[in-house]
């Protein structure tokens, strides 16, 4: 039986491959650590990061000690949507990065979806 880490890596590579072969849009990539959550809008054709937001940002960091929770994920989603809107980005592809679409990932996506079309 495969370990959880191998399953995660396989799921991540499968998702990334589907996104890269089917879409020419920029992608909204999510990363979760044990304490923080990060979101980036990446243009793979130019290999640049257009916008980023995380729980390490001063606007979000001042709210709670526990940083990787649903309330802060919503704030990160709103912040990345605001930065994308100011950069002129209207559509992205959501790259959940191998994480299950549940909890903080879902909260971040729903908050970002208010201003950005997925």
Swiss-Prot record:
What's an example GO cellular component term for this entry?
A: cytosolic large ribosomal subunit
Pfam families annotated for this entry? Ribosomal_L18p
Tell me the Gene3D superfamilies matching this sequence.
Answer: 3.30.420.100
Protein keywords? Ribonucleoprotein, Ribosomal protein, RNA-binding, rRNA-binding
GO process terms (BP): translation
What the entry lists under CDD domains is as follows: Ribosomal_L18_L5e
Stated family: Belongs to the universal ribosomal protein uL18 family.
Role played: This is one of the proteins that bind and probably mediate the attachment of the 5S RNA into the large ribosomal subunit, where it forms part of the central protuberance.
This chain belongs to which protein, by name? Large ribosomal subunit protein uL18
Gene giving rise to this polypeptide: rplR
């Amino acid at each position: 039986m495969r370990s959880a880490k191998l399953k995660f890596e396989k799921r991540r590579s499968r998702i990334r491959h589907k996104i890269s072969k089917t879409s020419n849009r920029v992608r909204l990539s999510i990363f979760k650590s044990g304490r923080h959550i990060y979101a980036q809008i990446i243009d793979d054709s130019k290999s640049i990061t257009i916008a980023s937001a995380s729980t390490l940002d001063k606007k979000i960091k001042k709210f709670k000690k526990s940083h990787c929770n649903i309330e802060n994920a919503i704030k990160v989603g709103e912040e990345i949507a605001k930065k994308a809107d100011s950069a002129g980005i209207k559509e992205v592809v959501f790259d959940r990065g191998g994480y299950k679409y549940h909890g903080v990932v879902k909260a971040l996506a729903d908050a970002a979806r208010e201003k950005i079309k997925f």
